[in-house]
């Protein structure tokens, strides 16, 4: 159903967000320039919609995408439940669920979800920041009706 597909795509976005948090923090710790790191990811096979949007507000420092950890936790929890109900033995999903559960306990339910990066920054005493990135992502594309998912045959 459409709601199951939405939960699945939100799960994928969350996995990308956590991977980006780890990658950006590792590059910062290695002394790489964050603007160069952003561009290197953007032009590579490691790019994603999540990188092009959420990495910018991470590197700005605002981390404001108007989506909070409690909402992420709800979606990834629903995905994990869907897998369990269908006897799919996942490994990454339970880890992501645990990471966000711990982050919510540490930072609060209403903390912006990109602040998952704090789990990596704080133990190292780092701030993963670049220059010239926007403090919010603005969707200025005109409203459209939704799309029907039509499988390729």
Predicted regions and their residues:
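Helical "substrate-binding/catalytic lid" subdomain
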Residues: 2-123
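NAD(P)-dependent dehydrogenase/reductase Rossmann-like domain
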Residues: 101, 105-153
């Amino acid at each position: 159903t459409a709601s199951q597909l939405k939960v699945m795509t939100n799960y994928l976005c969350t996995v990308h967000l956590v991977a980006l948090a780890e990658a950006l923090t590792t590059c910062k710790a290695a002394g790489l320039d964050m603007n160069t790191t952003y561009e290197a990811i953007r032009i590579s096979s490691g790019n994603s919609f999540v990188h092009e949007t959420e990495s910018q507000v991470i590197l700005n420092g605002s981390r404001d995408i108007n989506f909070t950890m409690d909402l992420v936790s709800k979606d990834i929890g629903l995905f994990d439940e869907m897998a369990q109900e269908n006897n799919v033995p996942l490994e990454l999903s339970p880890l992501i669920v645990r990471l966000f559960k711990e982050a919510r306990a540490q930072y609060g339910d209403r903390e912006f979800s990109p602040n998952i990066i704090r789990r990596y920054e704080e133990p190292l005493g780092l701030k993963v920041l670049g220059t010239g990135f926007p403090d919010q992502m603005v969707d200025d594309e005109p409203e459209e009706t939704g799309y029907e998912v039509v499988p390729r045959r």
